[in-house]
Amino acid sequence: MKAVIIGTAGRSHKELLTDKTWPNMVAKARELVPKGAMGISGGAAWADHIAVELYRLGHLSQLMLHLPAPIDNINCCFVDGYMGRVKSAASAANYYHGMFSQVLQRNTVQDIVEAIQTIGCGYTFQPPDMGLRAMFVRNALVAKEVSEGDMVLAYTWDRGELSDSGTKNTWDQIKISNKQHVSMFDMVI
């Protein structure tokens, strides 16, 4: 069975994303995702990173990451090849992982680097590009990974239906019945 884990990267409700929220997010996924499943994620901070964490903990047997940009294994960051301040998938990923890393007091991109260096983890990345188009290409790759019998977990700040977002973009592309929405408000202590 494959388990796709997607959702908030930390763009909203930053004040509620704490070192106490994170364990609740991971615990909820451990409860819902069968042990030994293959995890799939887009490599973003917070919700997507739950798949990396479950793999690190041995809960997932394999992991497939569809990253929005190349990753520098030495400096543990996403790279885009542009000099200066350019809005890109890499700069966005680094920004949100930077905030996430501060909360957890560890480099979460390093978690990804360590995961992709193991035999049980595969990954793809989008080529460097200005703008955020690579995020949507990555979303499509994540969505294509699943078929009936698999599952999707989406962690968002919505209650009920998902609002317009990158998570909803991926959610809408996935055509299986086992799709579960986890409200982040339920993860906050």
Language model region names:
Residues K2-M187:
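Acidic/glycine-enriched connector segments
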